[in-house]
């Protein structure tokens, strides 16, 4: 046999390299097709025929408590892209998040949140929905749908693969069948929970100095509602008489409860809530720019007294236990009742105490 020349060896080596490269790219191509990625992974400039689904997540947004994968759970059984406009304050965006999650699951769609919602909720909760990349948001041919604040039959059969929701949904009728999942999504980060529990551990009953065994979170909504409710909605906010009746309801049913008061009007609370029994603690800081401190306190209590608003609703929903709420807080002809259904806003087992509407009758007098 003739010995191989140096040139022959070089040619053989090059042939092996070429064949290996071809085999490698064929493997990558087949794998990308099998996983639905197509050529866009290898050729980023290639325009996709259908709008892409973002797999971009901001740091700190794991997809489940046990993984940091950037892909949605059970994504193989879901399709399309749904999101929701983040609008309003803390409680509003919690309602939007929970409603998006529930409706997307019901319709077999992938749910994504926008960066602004992530910025509002992720510092507080262990939320798992991925964040939609801005470039994907801008390229997607959305159909938009404004939701009203209660579940409707048509919401269970939405055929749109690319849907952007809006509105201020915060009704248990959307998501109560997923209560444990919603509670998991809104699990506080450890440092916030521990800080709130540390505050509660330091509380003592005023007369005896004993450590309380039952904590009742009290949220008193003030701020802009003082003008909005009477002037726009023919409604009222909770007054001192309502709070006294609600506290007496708990005193009659629980041994030595302590009432942990939070509000965006703490000065009003100190002036109008009777603390002479030694069981009322004004623990909230009232800082609307950092509402999670008060929110964490409320969720770590056993029971809840709320006035009005989504902040109080979510505190009660996550805390569990007994909840007392302000009922019938508008006049019967209020426009508010066109966008708000009490039976869809408050859980059936919650206890309502009727509001005092006499200030509204005074305003209506000529």
Curated annotation (Swiss-Prot):
It is a single-pass type II membrane protein. It catalyses: a beta-D-galactosyl-(1->4)-N-acetyl-beta-D-glucosaminyl derivative + GDP-beta-L-fucose = an alpha-L-Fuc-(1->2)-beta-D-Gal-(1->4)-beta-D-GlcNAc derivative + GDP + H(+); a ganglioside GA1 + GDP-beta-L-fucose = a ganglioside Fuc-GA1 + GDP + H(+); a beta-D-Gal-(1->3)-beta-D-GlcNAc-(1->3)-beta-D-Gal-(1->4)-beta-D-Glc-(1<->1')-Cer(d18:1(4E)) + GDP-beta-L-fucose = alpha-L-fucosyl-(1->2)- beta-D-galactosyl-(1->3)-N-acetyl-beta-D-glucosaminyl-(1->3)-beta-D-galactosyl-(1->4)-beta-D-glucosyl-(1<->1')-N-acylsphing-4-enine + GDP + H(+); a neolactoside nLc4Cer(d18:1(4E)) + GDP-beta-L-fucose = a neolactoside IV(2)-alpha-Fuc-nLc4Cer(d18:1(4E)) + GDP + H(+). Its EC number is 2.4.1.69, 2.4.1.344. It is found in: Golgi apparatus, Golgi stack membrane. Glycans are attached at residues 66, 302, 328. Catalyzes the transfer of L-fucose, from a guanosine diphosphate-beta-L-fucose, to the terminal galactose residue of glycoconjugates through an alpha(1,2) linkage leading to H antigen synthesis that is an intermediate substrate in the synthesis of ABO blood group antigens. H antigen is essential for maturation of the glomerular layer of the main olfactory bulb, in cell migration and early cell-cell contacts during tumor associated angiogenesis. Preferentially fucosylates soluble lactose and to a lesser extent fucosylates glycolipids gangliosides GA1 and GM1a. This is Galactoside alpha-(1,2)-fucosyltransferase 1. It comes from Aotus nancymaae. The gene is FUT1.
């Amino acid at each position: 046999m003739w010995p191989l020349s140096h040139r022959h060896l070089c040619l053989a080596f090059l042939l092996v390299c070429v064949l290996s490269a071809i085999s490698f790219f064929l493997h990558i191509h087949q794998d990308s097709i099998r996983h639905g990625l197509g050529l866009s992974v290898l050729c980023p400039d290639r325009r996709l025929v259908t709008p892409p689904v973002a797999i971009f997540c901001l740091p700190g947004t794991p997809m489940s408590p046990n993984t940091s994968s950037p892909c949605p759970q059970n994504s193989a059984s879901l399709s399309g892209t749904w999101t929701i406009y983040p609008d309003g304050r803390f409680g509003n965006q919690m309602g939007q998040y929970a409603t998006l999650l529930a409706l997307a699951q019901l319709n077999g769609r992938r749910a994504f949140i926008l960066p602004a919602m992530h910025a509002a909720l992720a510092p507080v909760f262990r939320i798992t929905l991925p964040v939609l990349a801005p470039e994907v948001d801008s390229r997607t041919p959305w159909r938009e749908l404004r939701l009203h604040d209660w579940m409707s039959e048509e919401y269970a059969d939405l055929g749109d693969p690319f849907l952007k929701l809006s509105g201020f949904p915060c009704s248990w009728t959307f998501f109560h069948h997923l209560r444990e999942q919603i509670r998991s999504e809104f699990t506080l980060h450890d440092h916030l929970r521990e800080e709130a529990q540390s505050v509660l551990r330091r509380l003592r009953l005023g007369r005896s100095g004993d450590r309380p065994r039952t904590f009742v979170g009290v949220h008193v909504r003030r701020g802009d509602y003082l003008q909005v409710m009477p002037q726009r909605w023919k409604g009222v906010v909770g007054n001192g008489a309502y709070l006294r009746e609600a506290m007496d309801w708990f005193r009659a049913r629980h041994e030595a409860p302590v009432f942990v008061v939070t509000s965006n009007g703490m000065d009003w609370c100190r002036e109008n809530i009777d603390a002479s029994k030694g069981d009322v603690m004004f623990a909230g800081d009232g800082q609307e720019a950092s509402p999670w401190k008060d929110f964490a306190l409320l969720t770590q209590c056993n029971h809840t007294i709320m006035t009005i608003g989504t902040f109080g609703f979510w505190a009660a929903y996550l805390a569990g236990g007994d909840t007392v709420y302000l009922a019938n807080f508008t006049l019967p002809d209020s426009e508010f009742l066109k966008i708000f259904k009490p039976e869809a806003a408050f859980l059936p087992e919650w206890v309502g105490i009727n509001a005092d509407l006499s200030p509204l009758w005074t305003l209506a007098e000529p």
